[in-house]
Amino acid sequence: MAFCNKLGGLLRQNISSNGNVPVTSMLGSLRLMSTKLFIGGLSWGTDDASLRDAFAHFGDVVDAKVIVDRETGRSRGFGFVNFNDEGAATAAISEMDGKELNGRHIRVNPANDRPSAPRAYGGGGGYSGGGGGYGGGGGGYGGGGGGYGGGGDGGGGF
């Protein structure tokens, strides 16, 4: 769905600006969207270089990035690999999804665009204050952490 929204936005933007559709810029945007992969389930020891090495034999890896926590510098257990062409990305998905990398079975999927609008639930509020609410990160009925879908083990609650 994100792909269709992006494509529609590109078409509207390019057609409305001058009436012509610059095919090369549209294809370039589509190529970038279809070559970026989400890699989940990474071990804490996987870094950018080892992620790149694991996917390099499928084709030219433009970028490989393990996402780390800003405060601790520790891996968050997922990352992204961007290939130069779609064929390499497709081969990497079919061959690497579910395979073991550094002792963990990884998930490999096409990367989705980051949502531009904030999520409908979560953050700020909830019955006991402190953020959260039904899907968020703190607060909730019992105070502490949690809420219906939140994180933490705030204790209390029901």
Swiss-Prot record:
Signal peptide: none annotated. GO terms for cellular component: cytosol; extracellular space; mitochondrion. GO terms for biological process: cold acclimation; extracellular transport; miRNA transport; mitochondrial mRNA processing; negative regulation of termination of DNA-templated transcription; regulation of defense response to virus; response to cold; response to osmotic stress. Residues 35-113 form the RRM domain. Keywords: Chaperone, Mitochondrion, Phosphoprotein, RNA-binding, Secreted, Transit peptide. PROSITE patterns: RRM. SMART domains: RRM. InterPro entries: Nucleotide-bd_a/b_plait_sf (IPR012677), RBD_domain_sf (IPR035979), RRM2_NsCP33-like (IPR048289), RRM_dom (IPR000504), SLIRP/GR-RBP-like (IPR052462). GO terms for molecular function: ATP binding; copper ion binding; double-stranded DNA binding; miRNA binding; misfolded RNA binding; mRNA binding; RNA binding; single-stranded DNA binding. Residues 122-157 are annotated as: Glycine-rich (GR) required for cell-to-cell movement. It is found in: Mitochondrion; Secreted. Its main location: mitochondrion. Promotes the cis-splicing and editing of several mitochondrial RNAs (including NAD5 transcripts). Plays a role in RNA transcription or processing during stress. Binds RNAs and DNAs sequence with a preference to single-stranded nucleic acids. Displays strong affinity to poly(U) sequence. Exerts cold and freezing tolerance, probably by exhibiting an RNA chaperone activity during the cold and freezing adaptation process. Mediates cell-to-cell trafficking of RNA interference (RNAi) signals (small RNAs (sRNA), e.g. Plants overexpressing RBG2 confer freezing tolerance. This is Glycine-rich RNA-binding protein 2, mitochondrial.
